[in-house]
Every structure is written in C-alpha cells, then in structure tokens.
C-alpha cells in the first residue's frame, strides 16, 4: 500500500499493510515494511523514491499507467525478488548499515588491540570506506579504491549469495572470515594469464600452487556489463563456490593466508575487496548453517569408497570391550564408569575414517589407531587420538599434546574448533604410513608424521607408533562419550609420497 496526502494505492493483501506508514507534519510517508516481497516490494521501492509533490498531485487516472512504467523499471534496476528461504539480508539496499571498513589486515593483529584501540582503528577504516563506497539503485558501489567493506557480523559455517558486476581490467574478490579470497578478475586480461586470469573467477586464488580449489574448475564468468551470481558455502575451512550456477570449487580447504601452518580462523567477517576498478554488488544474503546440516554435508562430500561400520542398532562388526559399551539413539556410547577398547573386527593399514562424536562436559575418550585391542592405546597402538572436552576447566593445565585431536603424548592438535559439550562434531582421520591427519568440523587441526616425533610427554616410550596395521576403535575412559555415522575407506597399502 502506498499512501500520500490524497491517494491510497493498494498493492498487497491487508496483512502486508500493517505498519506501512507513519504521519509527520501532516504528511504520510511510506516506511520500510519487511513483509513486502516480490513485485510489491519492488513497487514500494520505486514509489518511495518519487517526489512527494508528484504523488500528491497525481490523478487517479494516471496511477495505472504509472504502475505499468514502474513494473518495467523493476528489471532495469534489478531489485531483488523474495529473500531466499532461511537467508537474512546483510545489505539493506539503502546505506552501509551493518558494514564497516577494513583493508587487507591480519585479524590476529586486530584481536591483539585493546578494545579502545580496536574501535578507533575500525572507525578510521570506516571513514575511509565512506569516501569510496556508495549505494545507487539498491546496488553497493565501489570506485576501485579505499578500504574494503566488511560485515559487522562474524560467521563460522554459512552460505552466502551475492551478485556482482565489474569492468574490464578490474581485480576484486570476496574475503571469507577476513581471509583472501574468492577471486574476481578480468578473464580476458592477457597480462594476467600467467597467474590464472584466463581460468576465470571463483577460485581460492591465495591457496598454495597446486592446492585444491586454487583455480576454478571451469570458466563461468559472464561478459562485462552483465551481472554474475555467486553462491559460496563454507563449513570450517571447507569451501564450495558456484559461479552463475556452475560448481567451480568443490569442498576445498581454504588456506590461512596469514599463517599457513594454522587452520583458517574459526569465525570472521565477509569482506568485499576493492582493487583498482569499479565493482557493484547487490542481492547479498547469508544463511548460517546449523551443526547437524554441516556434519551431513561433510559426511556426504567425496564419499566414494567409504563403507559404513556401524548399523545404528547393535555392535555387529565390533569386538573387544563390548560389555562396556551400549547403543543409544543410534550411537555407540561408552557406559559411565566403564572403559576399555571397543574395536572393529576388520584390520586396516592405511585408511580414512569419518565419524561424529558427542562429548559430555569434561568427557574423555579416544580413537585407537592401528590397535591390537590390548593394552593402553596411547602407547601400544600407533596412537590414541584424544577425544576430549578440551575447554572444560578441569583441563586448563594439560600439556598441549593432551588436548582434543592430539596424538596423545606425541603431537599437539590446534585448538579452538571443537563445538560445545553435548553437541555433535564431525571428524575425519587419515592414516597413511606414519602420517596422520585430523580434520575437525572442516578444519585440519593435526597433520604430522609420527616417524619424526622424538620427544614424548613424560618421556614415556610409544612402542606401538610404528605398527603398520591394526584395528580401529574407541578407547573409553569412564565417560559416556558417543559415536555415530562411522565409515571407513581403505587406502593403498603403499603410502602416498
């Protein structure tokens, strides 16, 4: 509904009219009504930009023609249709609310600042950004200069929808968790063919040479002057990119540009880069991905060759301390005040295991790798990968090699990627020769060669670390830790170089 001092134009159901107007100084004004969608929303946007004097002077007979002309204008201005289900609008089409300036800057340095200095620095960047960013016709426009634009919100697992349009010779990108970047550039610029411009936009360009995702799988850019559409999904560091409907990056790890020895930051803002040429953005929506959906995506990605090892009903296919474990709600759970090793009946040399686990507050368990089912898995097996509620106060003073994901007593995993207690987590473990890699919720937290380890916790020997094969299992430590969706993929007996 559009109201002026004289005319009322109904463009939706009565429900959409609520809170559509307010009165001030004798005039009625259209206000932002988030319930207006599609054609109604576009018409509202267009009418709200017409001079009030024009609307007040308009005759009823002119309004139908006016509406027709506005409908035609919708396609020219590119106003968004309905917000996709489950997504939130993170650019309001009017101003820079929800965004701040931020150049290419190591987020760790920002985090080290005092709150006062951090606020001051962001304010400086934002003032710079305001000189180069503007809003035109619901489009976010940058002139090719100034600070980047970053969301005020920070995100962990999410899906981003965003359209862009740029010009020849421009170079831009989208930083994810403040980390560069999903690349945008001129795919016709021959001077940059040597660094991959001819392959097109959408790749994780700052990944190491040869790394998965560095280059897009195909050229998907539209010609200059046309809008391009990105769909970007990130779970931990696992990143997928669709450009104009083409899947150009498939669940690749985005490397931490600022510290390649560490995983990508656990959370961070989305940043729109400016790099020497005008670029326009519109239709920016974001959906945070819940843990259960994130785990399902990670489980189903590149799942060829995996064999389920748990039927969800009983302990068929498992041996060892079976009296100390139970099946509850489709998961294997260690009984409280019980322990021991529950292991597969099959042996494995090199393999990948995927599973989900749930740790109660202060809970402790472990993954027994190449175990013989006897003794203490931390020493008698190749290793015990710690399963622990690491952030519980009981464990504040542990050795770094005792926290979750660590090869117990030998190699420390990175911290900060475990979900809260009583929440399911996804974990993938790759065992290849003496090398072992642990990926937690899409983040690689351990990647080491145990053959190179020479220092041990408390100088305790680990005679089992050179075992070439054995069972896979769970090393219970008296806490009701649960495991489900367990699958294993065999790898060639000869380790990869």
Model-found features: residue ranges?
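Charged/polar low-complexity intrinsically disordered segments
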Residues: 2, 15-18, 37
């Amino acid at each position: 509904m559009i109201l002026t001092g004289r005319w009322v134009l109904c463009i939706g159901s009565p429900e959409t009219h609520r809170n559509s107007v307010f009165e001030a100084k004798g005039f009625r004004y259209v206000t932002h009504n988030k319930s207006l969608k599609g054609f109604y929303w576009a018409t509202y946007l267009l009418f709200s930009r017409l001079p009030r004097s024009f609307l007040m002077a308009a005759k009823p007979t002119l309004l139908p023609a006016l509406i027709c002309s506005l409908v035609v204008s919708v396609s020219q201005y590119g106003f968004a249709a309905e917000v996709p289900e489950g997504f939130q609008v993170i650019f309001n089409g009017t101003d820079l609310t929800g965004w701040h300036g931020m150049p290419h800057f190591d987020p760790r340095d920002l985090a080290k600042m005092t709150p006062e200095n951090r606020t001051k620095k962001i304010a400086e960047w934002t003032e710079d950004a305001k000189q180069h960013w503007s809003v035109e016709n619901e489009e976010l426009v940058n002139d090719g200069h100034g600070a980047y634009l970053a969301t005020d919100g920070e995100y962990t697992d999410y899906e981003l929808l965003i359209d862009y349009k740029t010009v020849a010779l421009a170079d831009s990108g989208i930083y994810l968790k403040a980390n560069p970047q999903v690349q945008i550039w001129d795919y016709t610029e021959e001077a940059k063919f040597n660094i991959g411009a001819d392959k097109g936009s959408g790749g994780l360009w700052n990944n190491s040479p040869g790394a998965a995702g560095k280059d897009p799988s195909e050229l998907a850019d539209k010609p200059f002057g046309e809008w391009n559409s990105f769909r970007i999904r990130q779970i931990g560091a696992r990143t997928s990119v669709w450009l104009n409907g083409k899947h150009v990056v498939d669940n690749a790890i985005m490397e931490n540009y600022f510290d390649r020895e560490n995983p990508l930051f656990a959370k961070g803002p989305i940043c729109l880069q400016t790099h020497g040429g005008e670029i326009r953005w519109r239709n920016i929506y974001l959906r945070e991905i819940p843990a259960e959906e994130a785990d399902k995506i990670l489980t189903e990605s590149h799942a060829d060759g995996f064999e389920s090892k748990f039927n969800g009903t009983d302990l068929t296919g498992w041996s060892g301390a079976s009296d100390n474990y139970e099946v509850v709600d489709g998961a294997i759970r260690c009984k409280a005040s019980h322990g021991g090793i529950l292991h597969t009946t099959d042996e494995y040399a090199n393999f990948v295991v995927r599973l989900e686990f749930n740790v109660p507050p202060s809970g402790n368990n472990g993954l027994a790798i190449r175990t013989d089912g006897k003794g203490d898995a931390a020493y008698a097996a190749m290793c015990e990968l710690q399963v622990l509620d690491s952030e519980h106060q009981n464990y504040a003073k542990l050795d770094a090699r005792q926290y979750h994901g660590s090869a117990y007593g030998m190699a420390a995993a990175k911290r900060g990627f475990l979900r809260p207690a009583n929440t399911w987590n996804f974990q993938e473990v790759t065992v290849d020769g003496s090398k072992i890699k642990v990926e937690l919720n899409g983040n690689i937290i351990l990647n080491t060669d145990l053959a190179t380890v020479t220092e041990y916790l408390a100088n305790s020997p680990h005679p089992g670390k050179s075992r070439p094969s054995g069972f896979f299992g769970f090393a219970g430590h008296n806490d009701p830790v649960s495991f489900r969706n367990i699958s294993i993929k065999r790898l060639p007996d000869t380790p990869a170089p």
